[in-house]
């Protein structure tokens, strides 16, 4: 009987498992509830201070951001809105002046016709040609692929939307290839003039955490950030009338003063109101709560 048991592989595995070290306990992630009250009681003073710092409106976002690139004389309303969408798609992880230059090259490629979905397709550019045109935009090949896919989709009328028009809903924009939440809320605001949500980019995500407006920074994995979490937390308490303003306000502030590394706290007009002021380190975040 004992010999038979020794020949049964299942028993030997079970015996080995008994001697194996116990698996480490699974660490549960604590979810931070979305706040409905301002986490930072001085947020109004902070925002007013940033407005003062940004009074000159001479940051890159002010002359090369999506709002600045919106040209009402650049074709029909459909063309203008399409160009806003293009600038948003080009902008991901790309500096504003590079985005602006890329959009202008797309406009020139379509001339004398205004830049629109059908006009861009009519140039006959394939993915490789458009990739070359977009250089040095970041992730140019992926963006060229998505742009052509979007053009082919928008050039045809569908679901009550006329040919050449971009979707006028959050859901419709999110269905487009390469278009995420950040781009969607920016396009809804700039192209359609509708305040549907906060556009949270790397500047808004970083500075909101530094100011104490949210506590959403991934300290364990700094390269794995979640701007969508920041958007939801900001929208939980920030009055809606500030949603449209907060993107350009913080983006320009981040471009000129509150840099990703080594922020210029000594030259900042709100350092006395900032819990992260003069903290040393790569990101200068406030103490962990």
Task: State where each predicted segment sits.
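N-terminal polyanion-binding entry modules of DNA glycosylases/AP lyases
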Residues: 1-166, 241-242, 249-257, 261-289
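Catalytic DNA-binding helix-loop module of base-excision-repair DNA glycosylases/AP lyases
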Residues: 83, 87-90, 146-153, 165-217, ...
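Short, well-structured alpha-helical segments that form the helix of a local strand-helix-strand
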Residues: 120-134, 173-174, 225-235
């Amino acid at each position: 009987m004992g010999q038979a048991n020794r020949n049964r592989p299942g028993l030997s595995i079970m015996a080995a498992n008994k001697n194996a070290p116990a698996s480490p306990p699974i660490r549960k992630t604590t979810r931070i509830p979305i706040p409905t009250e301002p986490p930072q009681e001085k947020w109004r003073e902070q925002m007013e201070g940033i407005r003062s710092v940004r009074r000159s409106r001479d940051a890159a976002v002010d002359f090369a951001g999506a709002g600045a690139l919106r040209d009402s004389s650049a074709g029909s309303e459909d063309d203008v809105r399409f160009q806003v969408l293009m600038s948003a798609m080009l902008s991901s992880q790309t500096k504003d002046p590079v985005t602006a230059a890329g959009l202008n090259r797309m406009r020139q490629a379509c001339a004398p016709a205004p830049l629109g979905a059908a006009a861009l397709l009519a140039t006959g550019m394939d993915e490789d040609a458009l990739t070359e045109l977009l250089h040095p935009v970041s992730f140019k090949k992926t963006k060229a692929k998505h742009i052509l896919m979007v053009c082919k989709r928008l050039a045809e009328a569908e679901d009550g939307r006329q040919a050449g028009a971009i979707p006028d809903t959050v859901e419709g924009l999110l269905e487009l290839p390469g278009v995420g939440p950040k781009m969607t809320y920016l396009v809804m605001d700039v192209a359609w003039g509708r305040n549907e949500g906060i556009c949270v980019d790397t500047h808004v995500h970083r500075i909101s955490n530094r100011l104490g407006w949210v506590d959403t920074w991934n300290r364990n994995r700094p390269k794995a950030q979640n701007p969508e979490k920041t958007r939801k937390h900001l929208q939980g308490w920030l009055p809606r009338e500030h949603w449209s303003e907060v993107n350009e306000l913080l983006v320009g502030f981040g471009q000129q003063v509150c840099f990703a590394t080594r922020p210029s706290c000594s030259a900042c007009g709100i350092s006395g109101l900032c819990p992260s002021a003069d903290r040393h380190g790569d990101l200068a975040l406030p103490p962990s709560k």
